Amino acid sequence: MLTNPSQVIIRNQDSLSQHKVLVLNHEADLLPKALLDVAASVDALALDYHHYLHLAPHANSKLRCYFGHDLPHQDPLEREKYDTVIVYFPKAKPLAPYLFNLAANHLVPNGQLLVVGENKGGIKSLVKLLPEYFATGMKLDNARHCLLFGSSLEGSAPAMKLSDWVSQYQLTTPQGEISICNLVGVFSEKRLDLGTELLLSHLPTLSGRVLDFGCGAGVIAAALLKAQPSLSLECVDINAMALASCELTLAANGMTAKVYPSDGLAQTTGKFNGIISNPPFHDGLASTTSIAQNFVTDSAKQLQHNGIWQIVANRHLPYSDIIAAEFGQLKVVADNNKYKLYYFQHK
């Protein structure tokens, strides 16, 4: 089953006949595989690890699948070139210029750019957002509550450098000053959000192997290592830009941790002495509640004897019931008008 944006691309796939195609920021469907009906070859870069895992089993000699903030093994001066680059307009609008720059660095001169997105997702402003090295965006289709725009590479784009897309700032935490590196598209308020502040203000003493689930830009990870530098810390997230941000944050603070993608806890192994998180479960959608349920269930299985589990969660959502069902007795260590801090120790 194709998502609505992917269906719109299929409606317009004739322009891809025998093209070498790059798909950026694709969704959890098999659109890149379907394009092989007309395209000569397709490379697909997912920025969401779940989307990558959905497509990766279908890779073959004509379909290469990647996860990350960039294609791997690229010479900055000699990037691989494509006849067409398809960009799925990102949910995090600040990520759009990054994707356009990446697309331009991979297009042949006058190569075709296609941008697709849902009407409610910000794509209506595409013409204003396209950099000057692209021709004016033209609306090609309007269907399935989505828009498809086309353009072509007319000028020379700046070379792709990750450092151009980072904002770095100092953050005061209960553990002290830390330096945060935030890439475009990663959540940041340039101050401690209320949930993270609540968690860090009541940080337990940990030891051994600790997991930071949904690490984002690495705020919790850096604060943890600032207070307890001997921890063997692992940081997981589903988002490529978040993982790259976390790595940059740790490096900026002279810290080390194992940073890697995981769909929920599926890619983690073994048991942890501590699991700490301000998980991205604050919107109350059914799909998000399901992810929260899986996280709670799976993390309970991966907690060592005497291990500590502490997460902050939106007090207005039913996560306390989910947590209580899995852990039984647990403490609400602290709360404010928006969040509760849950604590459990595996006895």
Curated annotation (Swiss-Prot):
Keywords: Cytoplasm, Methyltransferase, rRNA processing, S-adenosyl-L-methionine, Transferase. It catalyses: guanosine(1207) in 16S rRNA + S-adenosyl-L-methionine = N(2)-methylguanosine(1207) in 16S rRNA + S-adenosyl-L-homocysteine + H(+). Its EC number is 2.1.1.172. GO terms for molecular function: 16S rRNA (guanine(1207)-N(2))-methyltransferase activity; nucleic acid binding. It is found in: Cytoplasm. SUPFAM superfamilies: S-adenosyl-L-methionine-dependent methyltransferases. It is an enzyme of class 2 (transferase). Its main location: cytoplasm. The keyword Chloroplast does not apply. InterPro entries: DNA_methylase_N6_adenine_CS, Mtase_sm_N, rRNA_ssu_MeTfrase_C, RsmC/RlmG, SAM-dependent_MTases_sf, Small_mtfrase_dom. GO terms for cellular component: cytoplasm. PANTHER family: RIBOSOMAL RNA SMALL SUBUNIT METHYLTRANSFERASE C. Specifically methylates the guanine in position 1207 of 16S rRNA in the 30S particle. Monomer. Belongs to the methyltransferase superfamily. RsmC family. This is Ribosomal RNA small subunit methyltransferase C. The gene is rsmC.
